[in-house]
A protein has these predicted regions:
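Long, aromatic- and glycine/proline-rich binding clefts that accommodate carbohydrate-like moieties
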Residues: 121-127, 282, 331-383, 390, ...
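Short, solvent-exposed loop/beta-turn-alpha elements that line the ligand-binding surface or hinge
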Residues: 109-119, 199-224, 272-274, 286-294, ...
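Hinge/lid segment of periplasmic solute-binding proteins
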Residues: 92-144, 155-158, 162-164, 189, ...
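Extracytoplasmic/periplasmic substrate-binding proteins
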Residues: 35, 227-312
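Conserved N-terminal structural module of periplasmic/extracytoplasmic solute-binding proteins
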Residues: 2-97, 112, 242, 288, ...
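Extracytoplasmic/periplasmic solute-binding protein
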Residues: 130-138, 143, 162-215, 258
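Glycine-centered hinge/linker elements that transmit conformational signals in sensory
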Residues: 167, 211-242
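Periplasmic-binding protein-like
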Residues: 44, 171-173, 317-340
Length: 417
């Protein structure tokens, strides 16, 4: 129960420090806070910040690195004070609320040469909320299939049905075909399957809805996908994966318990450092009509609307977003890069990364936009994970779960129309 006190203390410290953000010598002091904190990541950010300070000797940057579990809460509390913060990490699920509260500055792009070097995806996500650049993404999270090449797979599965069949063949004794995610975040995987099974009828811009305005949960294809989701758990996955979250499903693969895993590119580094040596990657499986859908996770750097040094804050955001720095950050964190120049870098076009390039070049591997700006989004994240647990343990049926989700998102559509 001490977290709120720590957060308030952090905010108070920044408020007090913010009173002296300049100096008589003309030196400008910026305060910057990260969200997805880890020791190696913080070390890399400090290196990039040191390069910025070297190039701008009149600007000094203080980096605040809160613990990962409470970072977003602390950032929000600091933003509420509207003092003592200049640059911050903004995530895909915080940018909407931060901008709605007026905490984020609109970043200039027309006079910044680095804008034209950003990939089309980076430019699109920078202005995804309200059509205004409240952040510059530093990289993207997109799922791919990791699989063991020494477990009898001649070729990686290209459809969910093939994944199920391959997983059954791999499952024997204490080895299982698939790293299932039944715990927190598990509902996202069944939604991904349902999306693939709905195929071309799905509206990628509003990915919980079809082009005819019905929800993706209302169709016979949704029933097929959900039933297969349950079969993949029961027949190809470890029984305790009913409660697995991100760490457990990754560990299941790297420890040799499972032969397949679907996860983000940050796992590449984890697998490379593990004892697993015979593995590869492939684009995520498709549905019966040949389509695969997934959202792209992202985060980036933004400037506060109340910064006492807006020009310098923007300068730091732009520096971190330019090719050299952004590519270094993407490499250090196993992210899909934002710079066009990275496309010629061997790290992002060979080996485990090749699957991401293949997916980007496949018109039927479609990027979607989740309804994160709908009022019920946060509640659905909680409710849907609970429903998946009930589904996997036999407390709810496929029909009951889909009926509930269909009703929820039908109602949500009325609230935003």
């Amino acid at each position: 129960m001490r977290t709120p006190l720590i957060a308030v203390s952090t905010a108070a410290t920044l408020m007090l420090a913010g009173c002296g953000s300049g100096s008589s010598s003309g030196e400008v002091r910026l305060r910057m806070i990260e969200s997805l904190t880890s020791p190696e990541r913080t070390k890399l950010i400090k290196t990039l910040v040191a390069d910025f300070e070297k190039a701008n000797p009149k600007i000094k940057v203080e980096l605040i690195s809160p613990p990962l579990d409470s970072a977003d809460q602390k950032i929000t509390q600091i933003l509420q004070t509207k003092k003592g913060l200049d640059v911050l990490e903004v995530r895909d699920h915080t940018v909407k609320s931060f901008s709605n509260n007026g905490w984020l500055a609109e970043l200039p792009t027309t006079d910044w040469a680095g804008w034209s070097d950003l990939t089309e995806l980076a430019q699109k996500k920078a202005v995804e909320v309200g059509g205004k650049p409240y952040l510059i993404p530093y990289g993207f999270y997109e799922r791919t299939l990791f699989y063991r090449t020494d477990w009898g797979l001649a070729q990686p599965p290209t459809t969910w049905q093939e994944l199920y069949e391959a997983g059954k063949k791999m499952t024997s004794g204490d080895k299982f075909g698939y790293s299932f995610r039944g715990g927190k975040g598990g509902a996202d995987y069944v939604v991904q399957m349902i999306s693939a099974y709905n195929g071309e009828a799905l509206n990628p811009e509003k990915s919980f809805y079809l082009k005819d305005k019905r929800t993706i949960f209302s169709t016979p294809e949704a029933v097929q996908a959900t039933d297969l989701f349950v079969k993949i758990f029961k027949e190809t996955s470890p029984p305790d994966s009913v409660s697995w979250g991100y760490p457990e499903m990754v560990q299941g693969f790297t420890s040799g318990v499972t032969g397949m895993l679907i996860q983000d590119p940050e796992v590449i580094k984890t697998v490379e450092e593990s004892s697993v040596k015979t593995w590869s990657t492939a684009p995520i499986p498709k549905g019966p009509s040949g389509y695969a859908f997934q959202p792209v996770g992202y985060a980036g750097w933004g400037a506060t609307s109340f910064s006492e040094h807006p020009k310098e804050a923007v300068k730091l955001v732009q520096f971190l977003s330019e090719a050299k720095q952004s590519i270094a950050f993407a490499k250090g964190n196993s992210l899909i890069p934002i710079s066009k120049q990275a496309q010629s870098d061997p790290q992002f076009s060979q080996g485990a990364w090749k699957a991401y390039l293949q997916a980007q070049q496949d018109p039927k591997q479609v990027i979607t936009i989740r309804p994160v700006d709908y009022p019920g989004w946060s509640q659905f994240l909680v409710d849907s994970d609970r429903d998946v647990q009930a589904l996997l343990t036999g407390k709810k049926t496929t029909a009951e779960v889909l009926k509930s989700w269909d009703a929820f998102w039908t109602d949500q559509a009325k609230k935003v129309s």
